[in-house]
């Protein structure tokens, strides 16, 4: 299955577009790096001008959700983004439809080049656009490499007043590059306090 839309570039064109800038020092897989800049250009640099291609085990992406909204942040609320009109603009989410899908597709194609053979990618998206994004990810990573749709509960529906079911979740699409991904069980050992609280009776 494939999504067809105006402005959809070939994979070859995306992969052959070279970065217009470069880092001042080589990028090594042995050290952490924070890139402040355009993420498409950063991905091109990492694919073409670093030694990280095919070496990244885990990618997590939290892109805009194609909401056509403006999101703000304030000094009092530094850890959350909202749609308040009185605070400083953090970002404008104005890419919609096919423009949004191609924006995301270009970045996912480059991200796949960075993944190791046992690498995985997690993409956080919402219920309105997520079903289109899954088809795009099936194209890029292969439907056979779709691992899970993880539900993220984001709010309590008790205050939801619209005449519809409450919008209480986002989804995280989990794909691997091959059929043999690295997998670590997502468990945390009980602390001694947990054991005392949860298991009060001894056999």
Could you describe each region identified by the protein language model?
Residues 1-203:
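Core catalytic lobe of class I
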């Amino acid at each position: 299955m494939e999504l067809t839309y105006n402005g959809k570039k070939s994979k070859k064109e995306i992969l052959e577009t070279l970065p217009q800038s470069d880092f001042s020092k080589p990028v090594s897989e042995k050290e952490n790096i924070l890139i402040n800049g355009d993420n498409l250009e950063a991905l091109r640099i990492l694919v073409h001008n670093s030694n990280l291609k095919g070496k990244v085990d885990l990618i997590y992406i939290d892109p805009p959700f194609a909401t056509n909204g403006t999101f703000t942040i304030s000094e009092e609320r530094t850890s959350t983004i909202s749609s308040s009109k009185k605070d400083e603009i953090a970002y404008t989410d104005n890419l919609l439809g096919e423009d949004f899908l191609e924006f995301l597709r270009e970045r996912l194609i480059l991200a796949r080049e960075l993944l190791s053979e046992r690498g995985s990618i997690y993409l956080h998206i919402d219920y309105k656009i997520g079903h289109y994004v899954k088809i795009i990810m099936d194209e890029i990573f292969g439907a056979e490499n779709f691992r899970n749709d993880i539900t993220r509960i984001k709010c309590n529906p008790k205050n939801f007043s619209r005449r519809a079911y409450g919008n209480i979740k986002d989804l995280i699409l989990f794909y691997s590059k091959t059929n043999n991904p690295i997998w670590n069980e997502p468990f945390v050992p009980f602390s001694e306090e947990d054991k005392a609280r949860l298991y009060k009776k001894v056999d």
